[in-house]
């Protein structure tokens, strides 16, 4: 039986903050692996211009090459349409019935959990692990494991903004992700 962390997100693009959270999850919750799960269409975020699923998958895969306990899972990209966590977890539990799943979320998402589709069933299928930033105001919940986490002020939207302005993104993403963005010109003209 493996202890597997599921880390869902748009990963548009994946950045070092994502990797730091996954690394912290390995030790804080004693996980065997962390699976990055790029969403097809996030139900809670409407953003025009979402980079293609293939490009986001490739960027995540490129970002993970240094850590053998990280992998990318394309289950939601294959399914297409809106990505609901309950559907993903049901499918994974069916495929991997002996494994224990932990769902990684930001502390800011904890207060929104009651609004998630199928949340009562989901709480039976996974353990939620929330990464709390210092000073965050997430309500303590008995069915959520909180992990204190130093805030890393990197976001995918900040990286896209920097690229749009022709600013470098080195030290925000891995070199492999930076190279892929440049080769495919994923976010418009970028110089570095």
From Swiss-Prot:
GO molecular function, a single term: ATP binding
Documented EC number(s): 2.7.7.18
Any Pfam family matching the protein: CTP_transf_like
Biological or metabolic pathway of the protein: Cofactor biosynthesis; NAD(+) biosynthesis; deamido-NAD(+) from nicotinate D-ribonucleotide: step 1/1
Catalyzed chemical reaction(s): nicotinate beta-D-ribonucleotide + ATP + H(+) = deamido-NAD(+) + diphosphate
Keywords, comma-separated and alphabetical: ATP-binding, NAD, Nucleotide-binding, Nucleotidyltransferase, Pyridine nucleotide biosynthesis, Transferase
Keyword Isomerase tagged: no
Coiled coil region boundaries: none
GO biological process terms, semicolon-separated: NAD biosynthetic process
Top-level taxon: Bacteria
InterPro entries listed in its UniProt record: Cyt_trans-like (IPR004821), NadD/NMNAT (IPR005248), Rossmann-like_a/b/a_fold (IPR014729)
The family this protein is said to belong to: Belongs to the NadD family.
Function: Catalyzes the reversible adenylation of nicotinate mononucleotide (NaMN) to nicotinic acid adenine dinucleotide (NaAD).
Name used for this protein in its record: Probable nicotinate-nucleotide adenylyltransferase
Gene coding for it: nadD
